[in-house]
Design a protein with these regions (language model features):
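Conserved P-loop NTPase-based nucleic-acid remodeling module centered on helicase motor cores
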Residues: 1-58, 68-72, 242, 256
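A short beta-strand-to-loop transition that corresponds to the Sensor-1 phosphate-sensing loop
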Residues: 3-6, 168-171, 178-182, 202-204, ...
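Short alpha-helix plus adjacent loop in nuclease-associated cores
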Residues: 7-15, 171-176, 205-206, 298-321
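Short regulatory helix/loop adjacent to the ATP-binding pocket of P-loop NTPases
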Residues: 10-17, 175-190, 212-215
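Short, polar/flexible loop-turn hinges at active-site or ligand-entry regions and domain interfaces
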Residues: 14-28, 41-51, 71-85, 102-106, ...
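Conserved helicase NTPase motor core
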Residues: 29-32, 82-187, 199-206
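Basic/charged alpha-beta structural segments of nucleotide/phosphate-handling enzymes
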Residues: 38-107, 111, 125, 182, ...
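Helicase P-loop NTPase motor core
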Residues: 193-196, 201-295, 308, 318-322
Length: 324
């Protein structure tokens, strides 16, 4: 049991020599990848203000997730047109140099763990037979988040026994920007003949109002697996939607709502919780809470102002402001 990356890395450790790597290959993390790309951009004499390492890395990763090699990338008219229109016509050169450097260093990045596993199985029938036979039953969770190469690998591994169970919800597909392909879910019955579909339509977590609101939005999807989601919980309170034009305005609205509720219902601060999706969003809320003199505590993360680098900058400013 494991993630796609962990399971495939174990397979590659055993079979690495079949694709030209040694078994002790290094796995580059995101920082390693961007550092190497940055160096290549500099060596090629490209403008790093235009060719930002994070942007180039994103395009390379997307290509790998769709099994597009450096040569395929350079010969794809649609891709090259897009790169030209965004003033980055030489991404193909960076991609090719990056791939060559990784192989020379006996290194793979996270997306290589996927593409190299696919190539290993696709080009070596004996290796495919070995693992397709070993994996009698395959269970994949959150199938709506799988990308093109993951789907192809799953199909190869399931080719021997044809016993695969995929769990997912097409209505929760939100990672297309990372390469997730909703067609994997919508086309599952076509890709795997004899599929039986079990719809889990009862929502045990949310109130009836929340489920009804979700259904009213999802029903507008042109392509979907039809479902009639329902809840047997309480009706629940009416939903409230506040539109904000910036992160600062959003934080200000939240603080105002806290004040309003406290005044109306006599609540304490410890009865409120602010949920945000990423740690980077904490800053705007912290600034608004501090400005409103509201006490708060960060759970499961670190306050923006407690981060080492931020404390160092603040300490420097204090020194400049009060040198004595």
């Amino acid at each position: 049991m494991g993630t796609f990356h962990s399971v495939f890395s174990r397979i590659l450790r055993v079979e690495a020599e079949r694709i030209g790597y040694s078994q002790n290959f290094t796995i580059y993390d995101d920082a390693d990848q961007k550092s190497l790309i940055k160096a290549i951009i500099k060596e090629l004499g490209l403008n790093d203000k235009v060719y930002k390492p994070s942007t180039v890395a994103s395009r390379i990763n997307m290509a790998k997730n769709n099994i597009i090699t450096p040569d395929d990338y350079a010969n794809d008219r649609a891709i090259m047109t897009r790169d030209f229109e965004t003033h980055m016509p030489d991404v193909a050169k960076v991609y090719k140099a990056y791939s060559e450097r990784c192989r020379m260093a006996n290194a793979m990045d996270f997306d290589d763990l996927l593409t190299n596993t696919y190539l290993l199985l696709q080009e070596n029938p004996d290796v495919l037979e070995k693992y397709a036979t070993a994996f009698e039953y395959i269970l994949v969770d959150e199938y709506q988040d799988t990308n093109a190469v993951q789907q192809k690998i799953v199909a190869l591994l399931a080719s021997r026994h044809n016993r695969i169970c995929a769990v997912g919800d097409d209505a929760q597909s939100i990672y297309a920007f990372r390469g997730a392909n909703i067609d994997n879910m919508l086309g599952f019955e076509t890709a795997f003949k004899g599929t039986k579909v079990f719809k889990l339509e009862q929502n045990y977590r949310s109130t009836k109002r929340i489920v009804a609101a979700a259904n009213s939005l999802i029903r507008h999807n042109m392509r979907q697996i039809k479902k009639d989601v329902f809840s047997e919980n309480d009706e629940g309170e009416k939903l409230l939607l506040n539109m904000a034009y910036s992160d600062k305005e959003e934080a200000s609205i939240v603080c105002s709502e806290i004040k309003r509720t406290m005044k109306k219902q006599g609540c304490d601060y410890n009865e409120f919780a602010i949920l945000y999706r990423t740690n980077a969003q904490s800053r705007s809320f912290e600034e608004a809470l501090r400005k409103s003199s509201m006490p708060y505590k960060i759970y499961g993360g670190m306050s923006f102002y407690q981060r080492k680098e931020i404390k160092a900058v603040i300490a420097y400013f204090r020194l400049v402001a009060t040198p004595d």
